[in-house]
Amino acid sequence: MKHSKKIVTALLALAMSQTVMAAPVALDRVSVQINDGIILESEIGNMLATVRANANKSNQTLPSEQALRTQVIERLILTRLQLQMAERIGLQIGDLQLDQTIESIAKDQKLTVSQLQQQLENDGLSFSQYREQLREEITLGEIQRIQVQRRIQVSPQEISGLVKLMQEQGLKEVEFQIGHILIDVPSEPSSEQLEASSKRANIVLKRLNEGEDFRSTAIASSSGPKALEGGIWDYMNINEMPTLFAEVVNGAKVGDIIGPIKSGSGFHIIKVMDARGLQTKEVEEVKSRHILLKPSPILSEERAKAMLVNFQKQILSGEADFAELARQYSEDPGSAAKGGELGWSSPDVYVPEFAQTLNSLKENEMSEPFRTTHGWHLTQLMDKRKTDATEQFNSNRAHQLIFRRKFNEELQAWLDEMRSDAYIEVFEPEVNRG
């Protein structure tokens, strides 16, 4: 599960921060100012320690200390800008939602929350720090979804066009793991700046062709969004990857290095790291219903959850009917009139918490109240079925592929816009700002 993968990163980051805190340290100082916010030297040090630990674990060579520090500062700047945006729009991840996420993580690990906490403490980790790091991860995911999703439109013509293309390609599709290095150029660059960036890109390409490690080179040289991950993008189908990638990867072989490719953001170097065939299988669809309560100034988080707990008791005891409660109380206008019924669909069309809950239920089983970005839910899995890749499924899949591609492109555009509009000042290590 997605949260299961994140826990490893979170644990490692916490281990490093504990190590730093345990040793005597010099007085902390401001290293970066971002609008009205700051990044402390200790934050940079903690992330540097985490990156080094990850590199040691995977036997990965790292670039020079200065190059690594630059990448870490850039990552922290983008993170802080997103958190500032979340604060401006009033986005907060409450303790109840955080508790629910931790319960899901523990369940994925086949642990209770107490066992998870004990496991963290046995490793010398602070459970409170782990909670706050997780809160930040959820906040970043939510602010990206809120701000980027509204920039994306997927037209019926795009969907039908991709469905037709997928049918022409047949079922033997391929997913690619892409390596990406971006040598950026300033906004409105001069001809001299363009030439300098072009030369840098060609030097990087020459080193790669001579056998230099791609991941180390990306960490040292790239200004792309995945630089700290060695420039590696996870497996993507041609139809969901950013357009720039798709245009050059189609027909390429594993190991091919392509570039430099010029775009508005700079010069790109792309390497096909790996490729694999998509596994074709039957699709499981679920029929479900739910009751949604949305917290507000009038309805608190605690009250919304308590109401659903009471509904659950009434339904289980036979005092109330799920459909009638949904019609009377649910704040989902699309399903309330139908007794909360959502119809048949693949679980992955829903937000992750809802999909995860549906996947954990047996037929006719009702969930405990749980929180998503939409509010508090009580859901029941009514039925399951296996289906072939029907026309509707192909349309849904085409929509998802197009949406993911546009999301990746728009996310980077949004981050670039925020960064260019922000006041950012980086203070050199030797400058003491008291």
Curated annotation (Swiss-Prot):
Transmembrane segments: none annotated. One of its GO terms (cellular component) is outer membrane-bounded periplasmic space. The PPIase activity resides only in the second parvulin domain. The N-terminal region and the C-terminal tail are necessary and sufficient for the chaperone activity of SurA. The PPIase activity is dispensable for SurA to function as a chaperone. The N-terminal region and the C-terminal tail are also required for porin recognition. Its EC number is 5.2.1.8. PROSITE patterns: PPIC_PPIASE_1 (PS01096), PPIC_PPIASE_2 (PS50198). Disulfide bonds: none annotated. The keyword Cell division does not apply. Residues 1-22 form the signal peptide. Chaperone involved in the correct folding and assembly of outer membrane proteins. Recognizes specific patterns of aromatic residues and the orientation of their side chains, which are found more frequently in integral outer membrane proteins. May act in both early periplasmic and late outer membrane-associated steps of protein maturation. InterPro entries: OMP_Chaperone_SurA, PPIase_dom_sf, PPIase_PpiC, PPIase_PpiC_CS, PPIase_SurA, SurA_N, Trigger_fact/SurA_dom_sf. Residues 173-274, 283-383 form the PpiC domain. It catalyses: [protein]-peptidylproline (omega=180) = [protein]-peptidylproline (omega=0). It comes from Shewanella denitrificans (strain OS217 / ATCC BAA-1090 / DSM 15013). This is Chaperone SurA. It comes from the Bacteria. It is found in: Periplasm. One of its GO terms (molecular function) is unfolded protein binding. GO terms for biological process: Gram-negative-bacterium-type cell outer membrane assembly; protein folding; protein stabilization. The lineage of its organism: Bacteria, Pseudomonadati, Pseudomonadota, Gammaproteobacteria, Alteromonadales.
